[in-house]
Amino acid sequence: MKQHRICATDIILLVINVLFLLGMLFWFGPCDHVKEDGSFMNCHWAGVVLAGTAAVMTVISLAHLLIPDTGMKAGLSAALVPCSVFAFLVPGNLISLCMMNTMRCRSVMTPAAMVCSALVVITAAVDIAVQLRRKAK
């Protein structure tokens, strides 16, 4: 029986996604402005969607770390790509944000989501290549 080896990309994917999740919950989220009628602004919902997407990506990354099968790891990395693209498109494209560029949703949340998403896509692509190369051996 083969021993389960943890690859560097396993850890990198998990760290990026945990930081993405914690960032959206505590550091990178939108401001707490509420409309005059008491309802939340659109940027609040963009932050909620990003936190939820980051949570799903974190669970996928944790499964990626724990599962020893290389084919399954490649599939989990492939599943991270559309999640990351979705997270990249949410702020400002799928959910509109505040109009002022100086607001927290545009100046902090959007760049953080884009950077984290791009890092996950790059790392997942590298991991897919690594896992498929291992499977071919």
Segments predicted by a language model, with ranges:
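C-terminal TM-helix exit segments that contain a strictly Trp-centered aromatic cap at the helix terminus
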Residues: 19-30, 82-97
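Loop-to-transmembrane helix junctions at the membrane interface
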Residues: 63-85
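Hydrophobic alpha-helical transmembrane segments
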Residues: 49-64, 117-122
